[in-house]
Amino acid sequence: MEKKVIAMAENYGISNYIVYSSFCHASMGLVKKLDKNAKTGLLSTNILDAIENQEQYHADALYPCNVGMAINRETVQYLKERNIPVRVWNGQEPLFGQVRPLGKCDLERYTLLGATDLFTNVPENYLE
């Protein structure tokens, strides 16, 4: 599958605009092996799991769920020293097409914990 996705991105001329991301960290390692210039991110419900796999799979970014952000000052320092973006996603967000209330994500708290970015299905909820 990874070969086909990379080939499709190359076909459309969009390879430089894509960050491949997956909960399957080994898949992102394969993407890197197939295309050393590909940007990859590791989705995870736990930041520590993502950090553990980051070096093994040469990921460019980590994508922990906001409820999995139990990290300490040393972990934040480790990530900053390596310029590894930590892009948090709110595990309480509805998926596209779902209608349910959204639990508020404490953006300031996650910034203090080391989050560098937030990605979301509902950006309008964070514009203030």
What are these regions (language model features)?
Residues 1-128:
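Short loop-to-alpha-helix "cap/lid" segments that border enzyme active sites
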